[in-house]
From Swiss-Prot:
Topological relation to the membrane, as annotated: Peripheral membrane protein
GO biological process: mitochondrial cytochrome c oxidase assembly
Organism: Schizosaccharomyces pombe (strain 972 / ATCC 24843) (Fission yeast)
Name used for this protein in its record: COX assembly mitochondrial protein 1
An annotated Gene Ontology molecular function: copper ion binding
Length: 104
């Protein structure tokens, strides 16, 4: 079984699609005259689908890699900000301790 045959969607197989449609206009389709074209078209559509799937997998890997890199950058930035906040809090607590000693 193949998808709906559309020359615009399956451009690599357009010639075979047209040939099969032309063959099906005659009575030859009832006597197996179109079978060779049909098998060639099936092979072409399978190759086209596999090529699209391979490209989709490659694109997904690239998107996943970019997302992972961004996540790591965000984690590093978050750690840096957390460290800065902790340092500021320590400075404040040391300053408050020193001010408290002078008041006693």
């Amino acid at each position: 079984m193949h998808p709906h045959l559309d020359v615009n969607n399956q451009k690599q197989c357009a010639d075979l699609i047209r040939a099969l449609e032309e063959c099906h206009k005659s009575f030859g389709k009832f006597f197996g005259e179109c079978n060779t074209i049909k098998y060639e078209l099936k092979a072409c559509l399978t190759k086209d689908r596999n090529d699209k799937a391979r490209l989709n997998r490659e694109n997904a890997r690239m998107r996943k890699k970019v997302i992972e890199e961004n996540r790591k950058k965000e984690e590093i930035e978050e750690r840096i900000l957390t460290d800065r906040i902790l340092q500021q809090e320590r400075k404040k607590s040391h300053a408050n301790e020193g001010a408290g000693d002078n008041n006693n």
